[in-house]
Amino acid sequence: MPLYFFTAWLQGELAQFHLIWQSLLALVLIGFGALGASQGQWGLLLLLLSFAGLGYTLRQAGRTPDILDAALTKALGADYREQIPAARRAVLQDTISPREWMRPFSMRRDGVEHLADISYGQDARNRLDIYRPAVQGSGLAPVLLQIHGGGWTIGDKTEQGLPLMYHLAQRGWLCVAINYRLSPRHAFPAHIEDTKMAINWIKHNIGTYGGDPRFIAITGGSAGGHLAALAALTPNKAQYQPGFEQADTTLQAAVPFYGVYDWLPEPAAEANHSMHRFLVRHVLQCTPEENQQLWQGGSPAANTDAAAVPMFIVHGAHDSLVWVEEARRFAAKLAATSAAPVAYAELPGAQHAFEVFHSLRTDHTVNAVARFLEWSYARWQSKHAAQ
């Protein structure tokens, strides 16, 4: 990955820590008489400029809750919070705690049980983890399926989505994180086949763990965002369900983060050429000319229709790996075709993978996604009760 990505990612999400150590550095330099020499004066000037940049970064992150709430209000209605039952609204959060975002890599939370490495298929990568309330309620819990990213070639279920999963599990949800077969050893569509296999496993087995198999939402970032969106838009598609073609793989909501949504963008000039070469060499292992159906079928943007589930698409405006323009086009196309609500939030200053660990932006985003999922669950419950 480009050096710029890592620099911008860590600076953007850990700005408060950079401010702290740079402030300490400035005090040390002043204490050693740096202001008495021109080099020290220039160095302190550079630190002041850095302070200004970091302050602007934190200000951008501070806008996150307003941007996310505006996106949800636009898609779901001004009264969307009131559509969530009062008992569930009571456990949601609008604020964030410094105790969390000042400990960015501390993931575990009280009251959450973690069950590891449960098999859902025959391959060594077909393993899943469950995060659930340590003390389970009287009813079955709604389910969230988390798909990790990593360019379809790397990644693990223990590395991503943890702030969201622990947050939801503390509030009565059951979260499932899966591993799946990776390229280049396995070419696409192995990745989506495993995702569908995991959905089928959840439908048949999650009740044993306290989850409700009737309501499954899906999320993921980057390649996981692609797979989450594709799974949500291709329910029961037999070509992605070898050996379980008749299985029900419908989902009830989706929250893809910074996903790849169109493998064959039109016009071709808008294509990310480095991404295209990577897909040809490592993921699909063929060109579009050699297998147009495979490329087209694997693009979420080519599978939008009126039957799509409610979707909350989140992307960073400064994503240097998956361009934000692709998310804009996908959100617009989905909103134009889907009968269900489509919310789209574009976060200023956010890089790729911005919500992997706790930060100001991450924790505000987790709160908003929890509201969307609770709204989706309440909507589903209302429809189910009326049937």
Report each predicted region and the residues it spans.
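Alpha/beta-hydrolase superfamily serine-hydrolase fold, recognizing
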Residues: 1-387
